[in-house]
A protein has these predicted regions:
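ATP-binding pocket architecture of kinase catalytic cores
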Residues: 20-37, 43-161, 168, 172-179, ...
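Helical subdomain adjoining the active site within ATP-dependent kinase catalytic cores
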Residues: 150, 271-337
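Active-site activation/catalytic loop segments of kinase-like enzymes and analogous catalytic loops
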Residues: 221-274, 294-312, 327
Length: 337
């Protein structure tokens, strides 16, 4: 977040890095960052520095601009070769436990439905999920570790024959109908803002952020990933800096409530269907979403193994990878697939 002077120009900056935990870092002005709490938009903006390739940056900026225009994300004020200037939104991130709070839960369902209804100028073939997982798998199989606990956990992961397991998962999901929609692909509490001043309102109090993984993908993955995130708390202040509780995975009743809200928003004429037909659509989504939740565990498990090797952020990435693969096999057993 950067302070602006009265003419809208940036102040002189002394940039330092502030690690934020699971996914990355923010940059702040060492001289003036504490003043941020005293100013309001549009007196301050958020500067996003992008370290990825130019093509990816252009695509993400186009996506960001469209989402901002449709009020599904922060406003876009400008772009430059290595990043962009975004609206600073006075807010706080949700906590893990808030994901299941009924009013918040309902609005998240509405936001996801609107997101999935977007028509974006990108390739609509659902290549992102397994294309990315195959790339991650290739990287994982080439990794080496020297730290003893990393070696021990990595050896255990390799004993699962992950390439064969991924092929099995791919076959399962190819036989599982799931509409291709524009997905966020990283729906977790840290990417959902509760807007200041709207905490006690019934609607329009939330905003989705962080669209770096967004693409056309299977609906089941986006919702399944969101359900998986109910079980992970990334605010724990001791190593490995997260807590897993798979018992917090949404119950069937909670999932069916979510599907009801989702289908009311997305399925034309859903409210006019018979109760039996509505139930059938929700039962189909139950199978779809929980099977794709397996892909969420597998995807972020592979991602986290790579982060254990390359990331400088203080987080137990290898432990997180183990937690995700443990949850994968636990859910697979429960689903009997």
């Amino acid at each position: 977040v950067l302070p602006l002077n009265r003419k809208g120009a940036l102040s002189v900056l002394c940039i330092n890095t502030w690690h934020t935990g699971f996914h990355g870092s923010l940059w702040f002005d060492d001289r003036s960052w504490q003043l941020i709490q005293l100013v309001e938009c549009p007196n301050c903006i958020h500067m996003f520095l992008c370290l990825q390739g130019a093509d990816a940056m252009v695509l993400e900026s186009v996506m960001f601009a469209i989402l901002a225009e449709r009020e599904l994300g922060p406003k876009l004020y400008g772009i430059f070769p290595q990043g962009r200037l975004e609206q600073f939104v006075p807010s706080r991130k949700l906590s893990t436990d808030e994901l299941s709070v009924p009013g918040i839960f309902d609005e998240i369902a509405e936001k996801i439905t609107r997101f999935h209804g977007m028509r974006m100028p990108f390739n609509k073939e659902p290549k992102w999920l397994f294309g990315t997982m195959e790339k991650y798998m290739d990287q994982v199989l080439q990794l080496t570790f020297t730290r003893e606990h990393h070696l021990r956990n990595f050896s255990r992961l390799l004993s699962y024959n992950l390439p064969q397991e991924m092929d099995s998962l791919k076959c399962l999901l190819e036989s599982t109908p799931s509409p291709v929609v524009f997905c966020h692909n990283d729906l977790q509490e840290g990417n959902i803002l509760l807007l200041n001043g709207r905490e006690n309102t019934d609607r329009q109090r939330l905003m989705l952020i962080d669209f770096e993984y967004s693409s056309y993908n299977y609906r089941g993955f986006d919702i399944g990933n969101f359900f998986c995130e109910w079980t992970y708390d990334y605010t724990y202040d001791k190593f490995p800096f997260f807590i897993t509780n798979t018992k917090k995975y949404p119950t069937k009743a909670q999932q069916m409530h979510f599907f009801q809200r989702y289908l009311l928003e997305s399925h034309a004429g859903f409210e006019n269907l018979s109760e039996e037909d509505q139930q059938k659509l929700k039962e189909d989504m139950l199978v779809e979403v929980n099977r794709f939740a397996l892909a969420s565990h597998f995807f972020w498990g592979l991602w986290s193994v790579i982060q254990a090797k390359i990331s400088t952020i203080e987080f137990g990435y290898m432990e997180y990878a183990m937690a995700r693969f443990d949850a994968y096999f636990e859910l697979k057993k429960k689903l009997r697939v």
